Amino acid sequence: MRRGWKMALSGGLRCCRRVLSWVPVLVIVLVVLWSYYAYVFELCLVTVLSPAEKVIYLILYHAIFVFFTWTYWKSIFTLPQQPNQKFHLSYTDKERYENEERPEVQKQMLVDMAKKLPVYTRTGSGAVRFCDRCHLIKPDRCHHCSVCAMCVLKMDHHCPWVNNCIGFSNYKFFLQFLAYSVLYCLYIATTVFSYFIKYWRGELPSVRSKFHVLFLLFVACMFFVSLVILFGYHCWLVSRNKTTLEAFCTPVFTSGPEKNGFNLGFIKNIQQVFGDKKKFWLIPIGSSPGDGHSFPMRSMNESQNPLLANEETWEDNEDDNQDYPEGSSSLAVETET
């Protein structure tokens, strides 16, 4: 009976947590909807008197607004990509692993599996990175998200403002969202400023639109400052080919810690996020090279790392049955979450 109550309580808490996780997104949506009303109706249609100025303001605003909302939508609803079955323990191996009481035998099982996978990063102690929650050997740059309760390929961070994990599948969209958010706030602030001054000096009649125009400038400037800092930080990460997690915790390779292990040079670093076709850089469609399981590394020469020798292997590969080249593995295995 008590166990049933505990399970019901746990289920209720999980449900409440899922509902509450959408609150930050709802706040952003409400602010954006109000900004749309304030700019389009209260500023352009009511306050601005010149027809030509109205048209120009509205066309440019909606062009930015479309890309702003499009990238936000993609950041929210593009699901995080998880490691394929090659990295998971099979049902039989999982049963053997869980039933095995000898730690050294468990370690050997995982070492044998790691030797067949393209994994080159290790834990801080030099052990193979194993997730005991998902029962898989983590691909390079993959981490377990406690909020999403899954391992996420090339995980950057979990963002409450999009209620999603930012990783390999949607990092490009998230970066674009930051860029268009900065542009959105900047455009509003610059076009509203002159009317803000007119209202402040009393050159325009004090009507209902006054509040919306004054507050619109304040909100745009406030969000612009915070967003431009965050966007600048992520631009720096992209230029170094780092994730947020790697910036705070230096990745460890088979040869030891290397903070620039994935740094391929400025242009190639950008291409690792946006792809090599510049026509897709500003559009929120998937163009990041690779499958999220393997990445070219600076610390390995072309003979050691086939991804550097053949850039064609960077292209998306959705075949979970693909045979991976054997990679070296340490003899120690340590679970990491």
UniProtKB/Swiss-Prot annotation:
Residues the entry annotates as binding Zn(2+) 2: 145, 148, 158, 165
Q: How does it sit in the membrane?
A: Multi-pass membrane protein
Q: What class of enzyme is it?
A: transferase
Query: Transmembrane stretches, by residue range?
Result: 21-41, 57-77, 173-193, 211-234
Does the keyword field hold Metal-binding? yes
Report the locations given in the UniProt record.
Answer: Golgi apparatus membrane; Postsynaptic density
Q: Which residues lie on this side of the membrane: Cytoplasmic?
A: 1-20, 78-172, 235-337
Entry comment describing in which tissues the protein is expressed:
Expressed in placenta, liver, lung, kidney, heart and brain.
GO:BP terms for this protein? peptidyl-L-cysteine S-palmitoylation; positive regulation of dendrite development; protein localization to membrane; protein localization to postsynapse; protein palmitoylation; protein targeting to Golgi apparatus; protein targeting to membrane; regulation of dendritic spine morphogenesis
Identify the EC number(s).
Answer: 2.3.1.225, 2.3.1.-
Region span, Disordered: 306-337
* Acidic residues composition-biased segments: 312-323
Q: Name one Pfam family in it.
A: DHHC
The disease this record links to the protein is: Intellectual developmental disorder, X-linked 91: A disorder characterized by significantly below average general intellectual functioning associated with impairments in adaptive behavior and manifested during the developmental period.
Q: What does this protein do?
A: Palmitoyltransferase that catalyzes the addition of palmitate onto various protein substrates. Has no stringent fatty acid selectivity and in addition to palmitate can also transfer onto target proteins myristate from tetradecanoyl-CoA and stearate from octadecanoyl-CoA. Palmitoylates IGF2R and SORT1, promoting their partitioning to an endosomal membrane subdomain where they can interact with the retromer cargo-selective complex.
Family per record: Belongs to the DHHC palmitoyltransferase family.
**This chain belongs to which protein, by name?**
Palmitoyltransferase ZDHHC15
Annotated source species? Homo sapiens
